[in-house]
Amino acid sequence: MWLALIPLAYAPILFAFIKEKPEDVEANENNETKNDFKASSIEGGFTLQQTLMSANFWFLSVMAFCTFYSILAMIGHVFLMLDGEGYSPQISATGVSIIFIGGFIGKVISGKLAEMIGRKIVLVGGVAMMLLGSLLIVSSIFYKNPLLIWIGLTLYGTGWGGLYTLIQLLVADLFGLIAIGKIMGVINVIDTIGGGLGPIITAVIYDSTQNYLM
């Protein structure tokens, strides 16, 4: 389980490098690059080609890859992990539902919070919730306490739901609306690859170690 969560732990590093808006990107580029990267606005923004040259795009894409890897690895294996640790099938199955309920809550409240305290803060908070949730889930195995499972899975799902929404908001903020459909399409391909690898790699790790806590 620890190895499966490594990509999630890497995600906060990315946020330190994400600029708040296109003007911040331009401030650090030379004059030639400035001519190519124009400030994003509601009426315009970056083209897909310009976006693919932006470090912000790749930071967001790697973050999306990591979070989808982690959430789908958790969804795919939480039942097996809890069942293998001696929890009843009812508790193990309920764990999956809690993740989705938390995800719904995160998606609903993250947009409002982003308007109140800023998108980047909410984004970092979402990752922190996922990390804290994963620690509580691991602790529940050692202490055999179902309450830790419920809290941990709720935090995990809520954090992911918030991240899912904030990625889309940040794309609009950073790159504008002129090519937002194409940009989100590329990011969705990347996060889908991460989501597809999550359950598979976690299964390979478990098969080789016979332990989710490695």
Cite the ranges covered by each PLM segment.
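Extracytoplasmic gate region of multi-pass secondary transporters
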Residues: Q49-K112, G198, T202
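Cytoplasmic membrane-interface "Motif A"-like loop-to-helix N-cap segments
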Residues: M116-V127
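C-terminal ends and interior cores of transmembrane alpha-helices
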Residues: A128-F142
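Paired small-residue
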Residues: K144-L155
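A late C-terminal transmembrane helix in Major Facilitator Superfamily
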Residues: L174-T209
